């Protein structure tokens, strides 16, 4: 069985199509080719917000003004990967931001695979955006001890990966955490820390271990 990859990934977010509610002949887009790229160079884009935009009536047009599926436009212009973030419960509290939960990520993965695109899913371990300035612990876990939080990360990660498997749409890559240079799942997993980063390391290991338990073929 072909090895699948589990690692952190920087996607080259290349805008391949034109987004607008009305097509415009004046909205010219030019993307100059980059010479000497290796054949396995990933050309990807994060499209987590796409279902939300479509639900609000957004339409997408290719460079010739023809209305098309945005994923198809991207593929036509060289995109071969998409990234999908997963928030634990984006409908809780302030939430929103496209409600990019597990269910939407599964649906988008199926849609991408139908077009021959590969998929990376990105666990934020948050109900909202996780980045260097904020790594909010999901509300359901916010009163956890360190041991409880480690267990929650493991169990949640394993369940999501198994859900993708059962849906018949395993992602080609899985990213544990998002923009985690300052840690994740604050305050327990925040960096730098007084414990020598042990709590952060335990949380990371829990996520990685869960993926490999659910899918031993990942490296």
Residue ranges and their predicted role:
Residues 1-10:
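Bacterial N-terminal signal peptides that target proteins for export
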Residues 9-20:
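Bacterial N-terminal signal peptides
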Residues 15, 23, 52, 89-91, ...:
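Generic "edge-of-domain/loop-turn" microfeature
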Residues 21-27:
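Sec-dependent signal peptide cleavage junction
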Residues 27-79:
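N-terminal carbohydrate-binding accessory modules
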Residues 73-196, 203-218:
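Substrate-binding cleft and catalytic face of glycoside hydrolase catalytic domains
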